[in-house]
Amino acid sequence: WESEKMLAMAIYIKLQSRGTPVKSIINNQNRATLAPFLAKGKKFFEQRRGLLDMSCKHCHEDNPGNMARSNVLSMAMPNGFPTYRLKWQKPGSIHRRFSGCNKNVRAKPYKRGSEEYTNLEFYLMQRSAGLKWETPAVRN
């Protein structure tokens, strides 16, 4: 998930779509198949965790634009990932960002590529349908 080659390939592929809208892959034919994964991703997004007893929703839905320490909270839209993060000084995956968020709320992070993070990524991608691809974005 974090090898230079994998990130470079993901950036290259998504760069081809830069400026075009993110499209939902859910349609009438696959809705029943994909609905459980979408529901699990949404549940994870809204579920409290860690010593701070916070969910993704508390920061990214209830407080986007506000500051958490020295960072401006985003709306949790993954259309810029993999992204070059100034803190990392190199590109990183959205699963790396998920791990960082879990650490910030004092929760044990899941492994990159885990079912939990994959379902969360799927849910967030569906929420971002209609936004334009920005990969690779730059974040603080």
Predicted regions and their residues:
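Post-cleavage N-terminal segment of exported redox proteins
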Residues: 1-39, 65, 82-109, 117, ...
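Short, intrinsically disordered, charge-biased short linear motifs at domain edges
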Residues: 38-48
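Periplasmic/extracellular electron-transfer cofactor-ligation site
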Residues: 46-75, 104, 108, 127-135
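Cell-wall glycan
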Residues: 72-79, 90
